[in-house]
């Protein structure tokens, strides 16, 4: 039954894939199955609320029962865009199709490093994938002693520049990052984000400050979020959603410190009266466990998330819609440290709706189309609404 929901709560479990996509081989990801492999490694996952919603009706997950009739509609979605990074996944969810993938570098090319050194007048050290705290432990003192800029990346499309605020003034760091942003918008670099990472302190006690600044790419076209904002509806970003969309279409942005903080913020929004979309990204699955190839930690984080769903269920109103999905895979048993090209789960729950099999959706954009359809705003160019199937 098609029905208009006053509030839509969209939760992206960052990197929680549910099995190799049809084109997985092109990405080197044959056999990837984030949820399945975590469940195997832990001899089953204890996730009674996701079981209730119908997770194992999409694809059997060890320990997650499919015995009872699900209370939510369920299915899985295939990505059609050319990349498997966070920005690509989220942009496609909101109705865009990305045909030129953002680039991910193990090491930035000498040409790019040379241009940054010439512009800044400073040497560059690092130039490798690293966690922000580890790279400071390793290179922080050298930076303070020499004034060289610390450049590092991750398994996402990002270039980060760290500098001590007493060595490189903030305005100078921001100016360098703006230059980096300008020269990496297109091929051959095509980077999703440049991040200024200022810090203070001394060896053994470095502290990253709140003066971080992200220089993202704006979505190349209007997304469903833009259409909601234009229509005067609320678009509440929780976690890194606002960064992913460079603030486009966001009416209220609330940062989060962790998955559990994200769930705390979600509960607060459930207690708030608004009309529109509340969009949450839970990044710990990806950042702390997927890239670090830690299936035990990943499994524990999934179970902790599941335990919090009861608070969500209790607060949902009759005219609320809860959608749980992911943006790509990151199988912690798969070789390497990169994302994996997978289907993502789709669980759609309302207290007033029946449970339907939504099948395999041919693009993540079906989700955005459904949100647009619900609020009677302009439909995205990509995606087919499943609102009438609920």
UniProtKB/Swiss-Prot annotation:
One GO BP annotation of this record: metabolic compound salvage
Catalytic activity reported: 2-deoxy-alpha-D-ribose 1-phosphate = 2-deoxy-D-ribose 5-phosphate; alpha-D-ribose 1-phosphate = D-ribose 5-phosphate
GO cellular component, one term: cytosol
The protein's enzyme class: isomerase
Cell compartments where the protein resides: Cytoplasm
Reported cofactor(s): Mn(2+)
Cofactor note: Binds 2 manganese ions.
Pfam families to which the protein is assigned, alphabetical: Metalloenzyme (PF01676)
UniProt keywords, alphabetically: Cytoplasm, Isomerase, Manganese, Metal-binding
Binding site for Mn(2+) 2: 286, 291, 339
Superkingdom of origin: Bacteria
The keyword Isomerase is assigned to this record: yes
Residues involved in Mn(2+) 1 binding: 14, 327-328
Family label: Belongs to the phosphopentomutase family.
HAMAP family per UniProt: Phosphopentomut
Protein name per UniProt: Phosphopentomutase
Source organism per UniProt: Exiguobacterium sibiricum (strain DSM 17290 / CCUG 55495 / CIP 109462 / JCM 13490 / 255-15)
Gene name tied to this protein: deoB
């Amino acid at each position: 039954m098609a029905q208009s929901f006053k509030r839509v709560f969209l939760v992206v479990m960052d990197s929680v894939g549910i099995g190799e996509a049809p084109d997985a081989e092109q990405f080197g990801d044959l056999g990837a199955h984030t949820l399945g492999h975590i469940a195997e490694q832990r001899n089953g996952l204890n996730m009674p609320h996701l079981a209730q919603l119908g997770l194992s009706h999409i694809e059997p997950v060890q320990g997650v029962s499919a015995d009872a009739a699900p209370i939510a509609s369920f299915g899985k979605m295939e990505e059609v865009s050319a990349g498997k990074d966070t920005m690509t996944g989220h942009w496609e969810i909101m109705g865009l199709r990305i045909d030129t993938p953002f680039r991910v570098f193990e090491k930035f090319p000498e040409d790019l490093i040379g241009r940054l050194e010439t512009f800044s007048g400073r040497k560059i050290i690092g130039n490798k994938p690293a966690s922000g705290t580890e790279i400071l432990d390793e290179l922080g003192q050298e930076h303070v002693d020499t004034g060289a800029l610390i450049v590092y990346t991750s398994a996402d499309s990002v270039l980060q520049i760290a500098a001590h605020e007493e060595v490189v003034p903030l305005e100078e760091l921001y100016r360098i990052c703006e230059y980096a942003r300008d020269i990496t918008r297109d091929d051959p670099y095509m980077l999703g984000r440049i991040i200024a990472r200022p810090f203070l302190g001394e060896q053994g006690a470095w502290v990253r400050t709140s003066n971080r600044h992200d220089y993202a790419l704006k979505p190349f076209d209007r997304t469903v979020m833009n259409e909601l904002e234009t229509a005067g509806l609320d678009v509440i970003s929780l976690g890194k959603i606002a960064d992913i969309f460079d603030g486009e279409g966001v009416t209220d942005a609330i940062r989060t410190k962790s998955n559990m903080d994200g769930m705390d913020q979600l509960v607060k929004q459930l207690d708030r009266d608004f009309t529109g979309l509340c969009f949450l990204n839970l990044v710990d699955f990806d950042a702390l466990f997927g890239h670090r190839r830690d299936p035990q930690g990943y499994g524990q984080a999934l179970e902790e998330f599941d335990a919090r769903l009861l608070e969500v269920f209790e607060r949902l109103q009759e005219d609320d819609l809860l959608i749980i999905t992911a943006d790509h895979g990151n199988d912690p048993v798969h070789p390497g440290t990169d994302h994996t090209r997978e289907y993502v789960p789709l669980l759609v729950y309302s207290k007033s709706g029946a449970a339907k099999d939504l099948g395999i959706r041919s693009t993540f954009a079906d989700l955005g189309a459904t949100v647009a359809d619900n609020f009677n705003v302009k439909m995205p160019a990509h995606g087919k609404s499943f609102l009438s199937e609920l």
